């Protein structure tokens, strides 16, 4: 029993290589193994007496050596051992040659390597005799499949199930089903690419749009506000300018193109009626007309500016009433006049006080004096 306990840990090393030759140095070390051989040989003789002619007992005990020799002295035992070695070697060669094939060949076709391995695995299963240890066959049978999965690589689990039932799963159909969605997705992508305009089409449309817009007499700001009134999307003058100059992104160009195309169609349909054109033009920015001031009115404003270049709000109101002008027009005129005076005065020349310069109406302004001195 002590020898059996010593043998069991060594038997745990068998799953690392179930096809290892019995003469390997890894399994034969020390005199303890010789004692185990003697004990196992005695069990073998008892097994022959109890299970005479049983194939599983013979195949199981073909690995047990004779105390006088390594492989036993019986003719039937030697022939069985030679047959086991040749079967193991042939299965090893067949298995190594089948590793280079595709995984689908191993699943769809029952190659000789799989049959040889199944047979060799069956020969290695020990007999379940009442006197033998029940834990040993479980460990040994599991190790053969464990090492098979390890030698076959990362896909060993699927291959192992396929060897038990070849019709369990069809990897070819599975691979086709997995690869089909990307093809379907690519079909939708091609369809969307066909709908999107090309860069040449966008460039040609931007050129035609600019020509037709100028011909119709609309500014870029008018087009942006008209799009907001007609379709609810207000665009700035900068956006329309960048579209015509092809400075927007391709995505924004594609979004803006159909809106501008609809606006052109709407404008072309109303070309014959000036009323509709006036409505579309009125959708643009409302800009005040430039006010033209008469010569006599401009002289009166100039005289008042010489007296007081920055009048108060009350003075502007009274001056606008006397000249029959709008209050805003008078205010803007004085602002522009002060800016003009500031531009015409050199920066290096000190600016005299306004009271001294404009104390007398007959005295010309400072810039007239400077121009006379320079001449």
UniProtKB/Swiss-Prot annotation:
The keyword Transcription regulation applies. GO terms for molecular function: DNA-binding transcription factor activity, RNA polymerase II-specific; RNA polymerase II cis-regulatory region sequence-specific DNA binding. One of its GO terms (biological process) is regulation of transcription by RNA polymerase II. Residues 1-29, 56-139, 151-200 are annotated as: Disordered. It is found in: Nucleus. Residues 107-117, 129-139, 151-160 have a biased composition (Polar residues). It holds the Pfam family Homeodomain. InterPro entries: HD (IPR001356), Homeobox_CS (IPR017970), Homeodomain-like_sf (IPR009057), Lambda_DNA-bd_dom_sf (IPR010982), POU (IPR013847), POU_dom (IPR000327), POU_domain_TF (IPR050255), TF_POU_3 (IPR016362). Its main location: nucleus. Residues 194-268 form the POU-specific domain. Residues 162-178 have a biased composition (Basic and acidic residues). GO terms for cellular component: nucleus. Keywords: Developmental protein, DNA-binding, Homeobox, Neurogenesis, Nucleus, Transcription, Transcription regulation. Residues 286-345 bind DNA. Belongs to the POU transcription factor family. Class-3 subfamily. Acts as a transcription factor. May play a role in neuronal differentiation. PANTHER family: POU DOMAIN, POU DOMAIN, CLASS 3, TRANSCRIPTION FACTOR 1. This is POU domain, class 3, transcription factor 1-B. The gene is pou3f1-b.
């Amino acid at each position: 029993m002590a020898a059996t306990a010593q043998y069991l840990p060594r038997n745990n090393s068998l799953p690392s290589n179930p096809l290892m030759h019995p003469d390997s140095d890894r399994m034969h070390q020390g005199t303890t193994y010789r004692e185990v051989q003697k004990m196992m040989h005695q069990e073998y003789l008892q097994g022959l007496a109890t299970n005479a002619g049983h194939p599983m007992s013979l195949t199981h005990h073909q690995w047990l050596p004779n105390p006088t020799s390594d492989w036993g002295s019986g003719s039937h035992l030697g022939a069985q051992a030679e047959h086991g070695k040749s079967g193991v070697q042939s299965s090893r060669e067949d298995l190594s040659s089948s590793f280079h094939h595709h995984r689908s060949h191993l699943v769809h076709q029952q190659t000789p390597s799989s049959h040889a391995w199944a047979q060799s695995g069956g020969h290695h299963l020990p007999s379940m005799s009442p006197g033998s240890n029940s834990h040993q066959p479980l460990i040994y049978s599991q190790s053969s499949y464990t090492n098979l999965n390890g030698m076959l690589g990362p896909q060993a689990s699927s291959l192992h199930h396929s060897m038990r039932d070849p019709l369990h799963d069809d990897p070819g159909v599975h691979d086709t089903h997995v690869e089909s969605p990307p093809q379907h997705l690519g079909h939708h992508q091609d369809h969307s690419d066909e709908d999107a305009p090309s860069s040449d089409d966008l460039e040609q449309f931007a050129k035609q749009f600019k020509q037709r817009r100028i011909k119709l007499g609309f500014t870029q700001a008018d087009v942006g506000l008209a799009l907001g009134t007609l379709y609810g999307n207000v665009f700035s003058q900068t956006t329309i300018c960048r579209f015509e100059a092809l400075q927007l992104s391709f995505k924004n160009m594609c979004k803006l193109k159909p809106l501008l195309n609809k606006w052109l169609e709407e404008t072309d349909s109303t070309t014959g009626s000036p009323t509709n054109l006036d409505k579309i033009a009125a959708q643009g920015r409302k800009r005040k007309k430039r006010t033209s001031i008469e010569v006599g009115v401009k002289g009166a404003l100039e005289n008042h500016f010489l007296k007081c270049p920055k009048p108060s709000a009350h003075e502007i109101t009274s001056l606008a009433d006397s000249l029959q002008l709008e209050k805003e027009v008078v205010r803007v005129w004085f602002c522009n006049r002060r800016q003009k005076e500031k531009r015409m005065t050199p920066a290096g020349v000190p600016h005299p006080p306004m009271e001294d310069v404009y104390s007398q109406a007959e005295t010309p302004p400072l810039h007239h004096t400077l121009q006379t001195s320079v001449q």
